[in-house]
């Protein structure tokens, strides 16, 4: 089983991200479970969503404490140890972060590999608003191979429904996928 933890602020689309990722895995014949965790948070408060992917039925329904992968929608969460973004991330795990800067500035935060993608910039350019969550899914597909880009695209169309919205989101996910597919995955220690 592969476990994924998504870090974002309320209103940044973490729940949508988890749902689309689970839909894409299901499209490929895998089992998936996606769910959020938040309390009485208001818009902008840190929150998490979780996804479990497996080739057999997913029974475990607790929060993910030792993820194989983390996705960070809001880079300010990764920049502070207060939010525990890297807590429990497996040493051979992977952090995919919405970040336009140099990955070396994040290297001391975890022993796991880090991949960055300027998801906010991609979203602003293509969608006209900072919806970094969907481009991060493209980065996830390219960096991990856990879901195929075609399955993600289909899940996006199913999730958003409206052709114009879905088409732009597919373009954003594809752009991030292509950017990350060109990066070498080297451990930053």
Predicted region positions:
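Active-site cofactor/cluster-binding pocket
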Residues: 1-189
């Amino acid at each position: 089983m592969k476990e994924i933890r998504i870090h974002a602020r309320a209103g940044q689309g973490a729940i949508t991200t988890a749902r689309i990722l689970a839909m894409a895995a299901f499209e490929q014949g895998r089992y998936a479970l996606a769910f959020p965790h938040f309390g009485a948070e208001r818009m902008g408060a840190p929150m998490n969503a979780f996804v479990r992917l497996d080739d057999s039925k997913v029974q475990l329904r607790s929060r993910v404490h030792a993820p194989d992968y983390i996705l960070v929608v809001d880079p300010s969460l990764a920049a502070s140890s207060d939010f525990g973004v890297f807590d429990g991330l497996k040493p051979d795990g992977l952090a995919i972060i919405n970040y336009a800067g140099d990955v070396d500035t994040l290297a001391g935060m975890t022993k796991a590999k880090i991949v960055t993608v300027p998801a906010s910039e991609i979203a602003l350019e293509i969608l006209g608003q900072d919806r970094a969550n969907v481009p991060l899914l493209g980065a996830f597909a390219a960096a991990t191979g856990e879901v195929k880009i075609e399955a993600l695209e289909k899940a996006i169309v199913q999730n958003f429904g409206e052709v114009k919205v879905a088409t732009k989101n597919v373009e954003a996910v594809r752009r991030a996928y292509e950017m990350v597919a060109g990066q070498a995955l080297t451990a930053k220690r």
